[in-house]
Amino acid sequence: HLLIPWWNAYSFLVTYANVDGWTPPAAGARVPVSPNLLDRWILSTLDRVTGEVVAAMDAYDLQQAVRPLVQFIDDLTNWYIRRSRRRFWKSEDDADKTRAYETLHAVLLRLCQIAAPFVPFISEEIYRNLRTAGLPESVHLSDYPLPGGLARDEALEAQMAKVQEVVGLARQ
């Protein structure tokens, strides 16, 4: 339930990035603020999840630390990527497509760092394949991320939760 969708998200990025010849930005480059609501939502959600995982780990509650990761991977694969696919599939390279690649790349790298204590091998494999020059060679040598590094938008998160709820009710 957790690892295969995460691997598929990684595979999706790598497949389309290779087809388009996209290369990730240099290490340390901040993800530009995107006008796309889905980009802003997934980055905000990732920042919230980072905080939840850190708080649970600080309380030595590892079971509680994993729960937000499971939900986040579901949001990433079943909401963000599914609703962003057409942005990756466009034949022309434009700013929107580039931002989609940059966002997904940044999200997957951060996810590797957050999840590394719980699933070290897949985190390492994905990280090593996505890292750029200037980043530590191993996810386990990188600093553990803290919340606040990404732009939070709690109002957008609340709006998206309502949309997800409506879509979920319509599917039933």
Regions found by a protein language model. Name each.
Residues H1-V14, N36-V49, A65-R87:
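Core structural elements
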Residues V19-G51, R82-R171:
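Acidic, turn-prone loop/beta-hairpin segments
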Residues V53-A55:
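Short, well-ordered beta-strand elements within core beta-sheets of diverse protein domains
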Residues M57-Q64:
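Short helix-adjacent coil turns
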